[in-house]
């Protein structure tokens, strides 16, 4: 295969487990031309231990860390991460129930990895990410660490012809299910816009019966082309809510063609 991807589910495990998972995964693809370790653009999770594991497993000495995702308003300026111009620790992400953020400094979020083994790069736009990739070079034996922004820059460098505009627009879904499991205020604004445009809201109750809620979702598609399924608004039992949300979605797949 040209691309091998690992879903290591390491955000909520201990730092030791996260490092071990990444070390084993990186060892499996050690000869690869390019090794890319994804990070959340709001710096949640075990960033330092994961990167340490990727470096150890791959045998590479240096990580290039550029977590900016300009298309989503996430930028890195002066080594600090911003969301729509607001320092990370001043945003709603600071109150994440599982991964509260107390600092926007990328260096501090990389704790657990020796400073000599990684370099942090600023980027406020896609052009800066493209320049970074060009400056380091695709062939350099490093571990790239970033969000979708850096991944897109690497893709543009690897296959510029494949990133040309599409000759035809992609097909549009006729029935769309919007699953909302985040408590971020931005989701409330997005949900309000969707409902104003005619979307139907189905709220997942506490201790829900997935099949009963799935029936409600399927019935809602008879009235609207867009149905929003929202998890309970409490921060307690977030993992249970996520599992219930997934159980409902899996039972509704015949009813929609866009998610």
Q: What positions do the PLM features span?
A:
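Conserved, well-structured core segments that form the ligand-binding/active-site neighborhood
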Residues: 81-215
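Cap/lid and interdomain-hinge subdomains that line or gate substrate/regulatory clefts
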Residues: 2, 13-35, 39-143
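N-terminal glycine-rich anion-binding loops that anchor highly charged ligand groups
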Residues: 1-5, 228
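Short glycine-rich anion-binding loops that position phosphate/pyrophosphate groups of nucleotides
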Residues: 10-12, 40-42, 149-150, 183, ...
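Short amphipathic alpha-helices and their capping/turn segments at secondary-structure boundaries
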Residues: 55-62, 213-222
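Glycine-rich phosphate/diphosphate-binding loops that line cofactor/substrate pockets in enzymes
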Residues: 27-31, 138, 169-172, 217-224
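Anion-binding catalytic surfaces of enzymes that hydrolyze or transfer phosphate/sulfate esters
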Residues: 199-202, 215-232
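Hydrophobic alpha/beta core scaffold segments
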Residues: 34-37, 146, 223, 227, ...
């Amino acid at each position: 295969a040209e691309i091998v991807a690992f879903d290591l589910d390491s955000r909520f495990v201990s730092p030791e487990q996260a490092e071990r998972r990444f070390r084993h995964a990186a060892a499996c693809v050690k000869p690869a031309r390019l090794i890319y370790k994804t990070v959340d653009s709001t710096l949640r999770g075990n960033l330092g231990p994961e990167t340490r594991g990727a470096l150890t497993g791959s045998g590479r000495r240096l990580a290039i860390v550029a977590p900016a995702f300009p298309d989503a308003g996430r930028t890195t300026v002066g080594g600090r991460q911003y969301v729509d111009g607001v320092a990370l620790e001043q945003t709603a992400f600071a109150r994440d129930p599982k991964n509260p953020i107390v600092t926007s400094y990328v260096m501090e979020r990389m704790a657990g990895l020796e400073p000599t083994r990684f370099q942090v790069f600023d980027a406020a736009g896609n052009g800066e990410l493209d320049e970074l990739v060009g400056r380091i070079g695709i062939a350099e034996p490093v571990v790239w660490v970033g969000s979708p922004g850096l991944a897109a820059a690497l893709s543009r460098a690897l296959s510029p012809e494949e990133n040309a505009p599409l000759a035809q627009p992609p097909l549009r879904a006729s029935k769309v299910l919007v699953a909302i499991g985040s408590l971020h205020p931005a989701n409330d604004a997005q949900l309000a816009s969707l409902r104003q445009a005619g979307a139907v809201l189905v709220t997942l109750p506490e201790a829900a019966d997935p099949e009963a809620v799935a029936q409600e979702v399927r019935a809602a598609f008879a009235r609207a082309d867009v149905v929003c399924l929202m998890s309970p608004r409490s921060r307690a039992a977030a993992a249970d809510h996520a599992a219930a949300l997934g159980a409902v979605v899996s039972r509704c797949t015949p009813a929609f063609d866009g998610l």
